[in-house]
Amino acid sequence: MMTLPIVKGEYKKDYNLKHLTWFKVGGNAEIFFKPFDSEDLASFLRQNKQKLPITTFGAGSNIIIRDGGIEGVTIKLGQSFSNIDFIDDNHLVVGSSCLNYNLAKFCQANAISGFEFLVGIPGTIGGGAAMNAGAYGSEFKDIIVRIEAIDFAGNFLTFTNEEIGFKYRSNNLPKNLIILKAIFKVNKGDSENILLRMNEINATRSRTQPIKERTGGSTFANPEGGLKSWQLIDKAGLRGYRIGGASVSELHCNFMINNGDATAKDLEDLGNFVRQNVFEDSGVKLNWEIKRIGKYV
């Protein structure tokens, strides 16, 4: 029998995660936990003597939750982990559940440059740091000084930019880690110019990406050698290809869409079909950028 640690935060059993994801698919969390604060999270982790499986969940923007749901405890950091504050004139500390868009807007309002690209990346600061998210010529590695995190044993840890070991859409951090905060360097700029750049990015996204659809962002990371995943998918003749209720976007081939009745299986099957056909057509193995978690039905 599952015995849950005593916490200040909130537990929910058999919790429907579908409505929290951008794809609007997937099964339930066996246990859903929103900690009250970082000390509450640490207390939960230290009391987890049964070693219940732990899954972390962010904004649900770049993820497929499989139809069988998630075993164990799914942890989502709430509003208390979303603050943005100045440490000093040269550094910001940002909670990991803060949305990228909100940080971009804060920086524009405070004439801080270098964060404009975040307006075009759905998701949270924690998720972006974990995968070194990037767009429009910038990545998280360019702006992060260090992160503060907690491991699954409840130990608080700090990692500098160098220790994080940022790579293209990945890093060298331990797997059993929950990012709590990120510290960023501040470079002053002109508020009007920053806003212009953000508006340019938003206009480009609206023109080239299916942002009004049920999608999960870029499906595959771009392969090495300057190749673009969408070009390889298009070359393989897969623009608009459909499996069940899921399809490859007509507007941008590296996006999958839930047309309204897709299952998680439809989306994952479509992604795997695309990978197989691109490899047969071009000899290139595409790597998933979208995270797939949970059980198959």
Swiss-Prot record:
Cofactor: FAD
Pfam families the record matches: FAD_binding_4 (PF01565), MurB_C (PF02873)
Active site, per annotation: 169, 218, 289
GO process annotations (BP): cell division; cell wall organization; peptidoglycan biosynthetic process; regulation of cell shape
Domain (FAD-binding PCMH-type): residue spans on this chain: 24-189
Catalytic reactions on record: UDP-N-acetyl-alpha-D-muramate + NADP(+) = UDP-N-acetyl-3-O-(1-carboxyvinyl)-alpha-D-glucosamine + NADPH + H(+)
Protein family (similarity comment): Belongs to the MurB family.
Classification via NCBIfam families: murB, PRK13905.1
Function: Cell wall formation.
Localization: Cytoplasm
Location, primary (coarse class): cytoplasm
Superkingdom, taxonomy of origin: Bacteria
Name of protein: UDP-N-acetylenolpyruvoylglucosamine reductase
InterPro entries named in the record: FAD-bd_PCMH (IPR016166), FAD-bd_PCMH-like_sf (IPR036318), FAD-bd_PCMH_sub1 (IPR016167), FAD-bd_PCMH_sub2 (IPR016169), MurB (IPR003170), MurB_C (IPR011601), MurB_C_sf (IPR036635), Oxid_FAD_bind_N (IPR006094)
Enzyme superclass (EC): oxidoreductase
Keywords: Cell cycle, Cell division, Cell shape, Cell wall biogenesis/degradation, Cytoplasm, FAD, Flavoprotein, NADP, Oxidoreductase, Peptidoglycan synthesis
Gene Ontology CC annotation, any one: cytosol
Source lineage: Bacteria, Pseudomonadati, Pseudomonadota, Alphaproteobacteria, Rickettsiales
Pathway, per record: Cell wall biogenesis; peptidoglycan biosynthesis
Keyword Cytoplasm found: yes
GO molecular function, one term: FAD binding
The protein's Enzyme Commission number: 1.3.1.98
